[in-house]
Structures are given as structure tokens and as C-alpha cells.
Amino acid sequence: MPNGQPLRIDFVSDVSCPWCAIGLASLQRALANLQGEVTAQIHFQPFELNPQMPSEGENATEHLMRKYGITAAQVDANRAAIRARGEALGVAFRMDRHSRVYNTFDAHRLLHWAELEGRHVALKQALLRAYFSDGDDVSAPATLLRLAGEAGLDTARAQQILASNAFAAEVRAQEQLYQQRGIRAVPATIINGRHLISGGQPPEAFEQALRQFAAAA
């Protein structure tokens, strides 16, 4: 049986980050494998890879080529590697040269509210699936409202939030906090506010770390 308080896991990530989707799936599999041994509570913290992205988004291949100075062939190779990692975790990545990258700030605002309602994990999974598997525009209010409903949230309240600046200040404050703590890349998984696990690690790496931190807690 698990002992003591549940581990606090702060998962810093962006909705448009494929390695964040892989990292979350790995973390969740690790926690499932450790059921009865380790208990934990996941909290999602916001990080925007492209905070200046316009509302219409941008072709993802062109964006990655310009941002990282790589070729279209290298983008394709990276996607193939991500697809393979995803398949092993049951995550379907259907990205291609027509995929687009979108602004994710409103998605982060909804996620902040969803945690207050206890539905943040369901919404996060819905957002990742919509973007990476279905190719949906996760900046579009209609998409966000549909996903909020799928996650068991009140869509009327979600619509009010999206039509206002609700939780914008809170999201900005959290983004700034984790930047001040040195988080420059995501995913970043922080255990009990002290231990950092960087990147989309495989489940066994999370298992080992979580078991170690739980024993030391």
C-alpha cells in the first residue's frame, strides 16, 4: 500500500507539443503500473511554445523549418520518430506536411478552469487527441467548447470564459513563475516542487523516478 501523502506532479507543457503528449502518456502509464505502490496528483502548468502565433495559425512544417533551421525531410524524420513513440503508448499522431500549429493561450485558460472543476486531465487528453490525432484547430472557440463538453465541463460557462479574459492573468502568472524557475523546454515534470524530469521520457524512466521520490517523501 502507498504510504504518506500523494506525490504532487506539476506537468509543464503545451497543447501543441508532441513530446508533451508522449511524456504525459508515459507518466500516466507509469502511474498505472505503480498503482498500489505510489499515489500522485497531476497538475498541469502552462507553457506556450509559440505565444505570438496569430489566430489563423501557420503551416507546421514551414514553422519548424524556420524556427529550428531544419529541412522538410528532417521534419518528416522527426515526425516518424514521434509517431513510433506514440504507437508504443497508444497515442495516434497523424501529423503531415499539411498540419498547422495554432495559438494555445485560450486552451491554457480553459485548462486552468478545468482544474478548479476537477476535469483537467480529461480536458488535456481531449485537447491533445484533437490536435495530434484529429488535426483540429485548438484555438477555435467552437473546437474548445466541444472539447470542454466532452471533458464533462459546463459548455455555457466555458463559452463565458472564452468570450472574456477570465483566467488570463492566472495563466500568465504561472507561465512567468515556471520561466523564472528555469523551465525553457517542455515537457518538464516536477515532483513535489523539487525534482525535475525533463523531456518525453519512457514509462520505465518515470516509474524508477516516482518510486525513488515516493520512498524519500
Could you say what each language-model-derived stretch is?
Residues N3-G36, A40, F44, L111-A217:
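C-terminal cap of thioredoxin/glutaredoxin-like
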